A protein has these predicted regions:
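Conserved active-site alpha-helix within GNAT-family acetyltransferase domains
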Residues: 135-154
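Conserved GNAT acetyl-CoA-binding A-motif
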Residues: 121-134
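Conserved acetyl-CoA-binding loop-helix of GNAT-fold acetyltransferases
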Residues: 100, 106-119, 147
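A short, internal acetyl-CoA/4′-phosphopantetheine-binding micro-motif in the GNAT/acyltransferase core
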Residues: 96-106, 134-135
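Conserved beta-hairpin
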Residues: 54-72
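Conserved acyl-donor/pantetheine-binding loop and adjacent beta-alpha core of acyl/acetyltransferases
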Residues: 69-97
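Short amphipathic alpha-helix that is part of the acyltransferase structural core
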Residues: 2-43, 63-65
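C-terminal "cap" of GNAT-fold acetyltransferases
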Residues: 6, 155-168
Length: 168
């Protein structure tokens, strides 16, 4: 589906990424740490995709320039942040990670991804759940999610970082 004349989105099945796409997703993820959690390896990314329920790629031509990975309730995902929502919500769509290449930010791509996620969640009337780092602070993400209508429902401090939990 086209976002505009320059970019398109592609729904990615959990086993649908080819090796070049996996490498680019991994590289984008690592380039966006600590805003998104670091991945140990491309194998770790593959495991996340296997656990995931809904994923999108943003492409410019054939180049992957952004992605989002989402989980549903009932997953075996071991993330403490995911577990927070599992304890609070019966059904949900959890945004595990989203990243856009720095060169393509402020072009409406984040909004386009979330608009698609909102439409997907609407099918089953699911709340969308996510966390944002508050230490170190990810102010652009906090601002973005506030603007998109997310409400904070909790927070947690870890040994090396802190997060705020949001739903919409």
């Amino acid at each position: 589906m086209a976002i505009n004349s320059k970019f398109k989105m592609l729904v990615l099945s959990h086993d649908g990424a080819h090796d070049g796409q996996l490498q680019k997703i991994y590289d984008l993820n690592q380039a966006n740490t600590p805003e998104v959690g670091s991945l140990e390896s491309k194998k770790h990314l593959t495991k996340l995709l296997e656990l995931s329920a809904y994923n999108l790629l943003i492409l410019k031509g054939d180049e992957v320039i952004g992605f989002i990975i989402c989980m549903r309730e009932g997953s075996d995902y071991g993330s403490e942040n995911y577990k927070f929502f599992s304890k609070k919500l019966k059904k949900f769509l959890y945004v595990d990670r989203v990243a856009i290449d720095k060169k393509y930010r402020r072009e409406g791509l984040g909004k386009a991804i979330y608009d698609d996620i909102f439409n997907e969640a609407k099918i089953e009337n699911l709340p969308i759940a996510l966390e944002v780092n508050t230490e170190p602070v990810n102010q652009p993400s906090l601002n973005f999610h506030e603007k998109m209508g997310f409400d904070q429902i909790g927070a947690k401090e870890f040994a090396d970082h802190s997060v705020a939990y949001f739903i919409k």
